[in-house]
Amino acid sequence: MKHTLILLLAFGLFAMTANAQCRSFTKKNCLSSLDGYIQNDNYNSAILIPGDEAELMLTFLAGQDYRLIVCSHPVLGEVSYEINDASGKRLFDSRKNEPDVNHVDFKVETTQQLQIHVQVPDSKSAIMHEGCVTVLVGSKS
């Protein structure tokens, strides 16, 4: 029982440290991309490895201009992302639109939920690097 408690405490501290590292990475490397947009209160970040995928549902309000940013640590390579509506219809694909741009600006006509799907490319390296991937949303009225 004592060993289990120590192990759980160690995992908890590791998770807190990883989250703090992602927050620091986001502040230093991602927030400036919002330029002119007001960041929403959500902080959406994860530590991913090559081959990982993550999905996130976000609500966007009618009549507002938005900037969605997918910012990732360079060690992960060219992270791609898609934006889909609630029915699964693809609205944006970073691989087809502008692969070197980490953000997309848009306006929604009706309040709706959109699904953000992020994919880290596979790596042929024997060493698995992990890195932070952050999805930021900013808005203008």
Task: Describe these PLM feature segments.
Residues 4-14:
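Sec-dependent N-terminal signal peptides
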Residues 14-20:
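Sec/Tat signal peptide C-region and signal peptidase I cleavage site
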Residues 20-37:
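Predominantly extracellular/luminal regions of secreted and cell-surface proteins
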Residues 21-23, 46-129, 138-141:
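Acidic, Ser/Thr/Pro-rich low-complexity intrinsically disordered segments
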Residues 38-40, 62:
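Short Pro/Gly-enriched beta-strand edge/turn motifs at strand-loop
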